[in-house]
């Protein structure tokens, strides 16, 4: 089986040495290397050109989203490119990944997306980095969605209409949902894919990342929640229940009788319940994260009610 033409689209802003490491890891693995820059001030665009990448400078007069950046990279792919590897600029691609994923895709013509194991480069640096590493350890086999790093079949992405550019987060699961509706498959392979440098060292960074997830849940449910997949409906409801409705109900009950404040013990009880399945650390932050997710979901509803759109929610 002959090797298919493959490109890579890398997106980033001010990633510095991480971007250089990312682009170098792709050299020799792809026939076309594209870097989409969203307003870097650290010389990222020039460094990418020096490494042989086609550089696209995103028009920042329009609202920025990662989805817009990925579509901009798609738009400059050369004719004949069969697969495209999407990568975030803070990731390093495993030297065997693209060949492994491309072989799988060629052997499975209904596969539109293949992703592998994304690992955190420095999980020992912070609890938040460890949480990211655990989050990316998803089951092997046919899947519902991928993350930001994945090899995709170009014709499938084009016919699906590309990424939904208005989404500030959750753009990959939304695209995967449309691909699956069109009869395509999403696969998680048992193979090393990328090393990611999350650099989440402070609670505030983790909180904003969780807020962004809650916003994505609510927006995804608003877009596709009525479908048979019930896209992110359960995730949104859990966030709003544990992060908003229950705290308000407990506070109001405590106004009637202070002893009813004991109902708040449901939270440590939930941590202990989840600890049996995921360990104490992950369970604790899973419960804490519901407050941040609820904040993000409520923020989405607030902006939708006002007829406005929220800008990107960054955590680095």
Task: Annotate the PLM regions.
Residues 119-121, 135-152, 159, 168, ...:
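A recurrent flexible, glycine/aromatic-enriched loop bordering the glycosyltransferase active site
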Residues 241-307:
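Membrane-embedded multi-pass helical conduit in multi-pass membrane proteins
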Residues 92-127:
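Conserved donor NDP-sugar-binding/catalytic core segment of glycosyltransferases
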């Amino acid at each position: 089986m002959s090797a298919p033409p493959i490109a890579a689209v890398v997106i980033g802003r001010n990633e510095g040495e991480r971007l250089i490491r990312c682009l170098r890891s792709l050299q020799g693995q792809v026939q076309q290397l594209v870097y989409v820059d969203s307003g870097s001030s650290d010389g990222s665009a020039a460094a990418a050109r020096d490494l042989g990448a086609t550089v696209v400078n995103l028009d920042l007069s329009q609202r920025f989203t990662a989805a817009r950046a990925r579509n901009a990279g798609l738009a400059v792919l050369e004719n004949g490119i069969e697969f495209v590897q999407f990568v975030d600029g803070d990731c390093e691609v495993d030297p065997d990944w693209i060949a492994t994923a491309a072989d799988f895709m060629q052997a499975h013509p209904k596969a539109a997306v293949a992703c592998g194991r994304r690992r955190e480069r420095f999980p020992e640096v912070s609890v938040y980095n460890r949480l990211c590493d655990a989050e990316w350890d998803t089951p092997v086999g046919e899947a519902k969605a991928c993350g930001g790093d994945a090899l995709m079949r170009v014709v499938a992405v084009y016919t699906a209409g590309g990424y939904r550019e208005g989404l500030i987060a959750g753009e990959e699961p939304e695209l995967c949902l449309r691909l699956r509706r069109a009869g395509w498959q999403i696969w998680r392979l048992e193979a090393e894919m990328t090393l990611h440098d999350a650099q989440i060292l402070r609670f505030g960074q983790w909180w904003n990342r969780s807020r962004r997830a809650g916003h994505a849940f609510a927006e995804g449910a608003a877009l596709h929640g009525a479908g048979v997949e019930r896209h992110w409906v359960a995730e949104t409801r859990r966030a709003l229940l544990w992060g908003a409705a229950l705290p308000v109900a407990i506070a109001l009950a405590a106004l009637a009788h202070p002893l009813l404040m004991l109902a708040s013990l449901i939270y440590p009880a939930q941590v202990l319940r989840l600890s049996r399945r995921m360990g104490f650390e992950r369970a604790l932050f899973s419960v804490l994260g519901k407050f941040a997710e609820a904040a993000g979901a409520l923020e989405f509803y607030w902006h939708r009610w006002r007829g406005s759109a929220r800008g990107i929610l960054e955590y680095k």
